[in-house]
Design a protein with these regions (language model features):
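Helix-loop-strand module that forms the ligand-binding subsite of alpha/beta enzymes
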Residues: 34-121
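A Lys/Arg-rich helix-loop hairpin that forms a DNA/phosphate-binding surface
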Residues: 31
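Long, highly hydrophobic alpha-helical transmembrane signal-anchor segments
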Residues: 124-125
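Extreme N-terminal starter segment of soluble prokaryotic enzymes
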Residues: 1-5
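Short N-terminal binding/cap micro-motifs at the start of the first secondary-structure element
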Residues: 12-18
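Conserved small/polar residues in nucleotide/adenosyl-binding loops
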Residues: 128-130
Length: 130
């Protein structure tokens, strides 16, 4: 069994959260970067014995369309998966539901979901003067 991180993290915040969570799971880790527009995601075949973490940010309360489309190309084969939605300055609204729909279509078995708060990527705390 190995841990597979499927991550869409254009600014690195979601990746940090994913690594923190997956780092608690004791196994070898493989990362699939959904930000790579040129990658052939259909080449990834996940084993039912693998544990998968799917992480992406919430953009305006929605899952990024590019991330969802790329996720749908990966064969989940019944592997257990945890969804992680990372959001900053507002609510995550439908993001987890959209991630769940895409993961199920890809053949993953959703076991848990996490909504994690991270620093807002457009307006980092270092730029806010209070």
């Amino acid at each position: 069994m190995k841990t597979i991180e499927i991550i869409f993290s254009p600014t690195g915040g979601t990746e940090k959260v994913a690594h923190i969570i997956a780092g608690r799971w004791a196994s070898d880790t493989v990362t699939i970067d959904l930000c790579d527009a040129k990658a052939d995601f259909s080449q990834w075949v996940i084993s039912k014995e693998d544990q998968v973490l799917i992480a992406m940010p919430s953009f305006g309360g929605r899952a990024p369309a590019a991330a969802i489309e790329r996720l749908k190309r990966i064969a989940g084969n019944g592997a257990a998966c945890t969804l992680v939605c990372v959001y900053g300055n507002r609510a995550y609204e439908d993001t987890l539901a959209e991630m769940e729909d895409a993961a199920k279509q890809s053949g993953f078995q959703i076991k848990a979901a996490v909504a994690a708060v991270a620093e807002h990527s457009i307006l980092p705390l270092s730029l806010i003067h209070i």
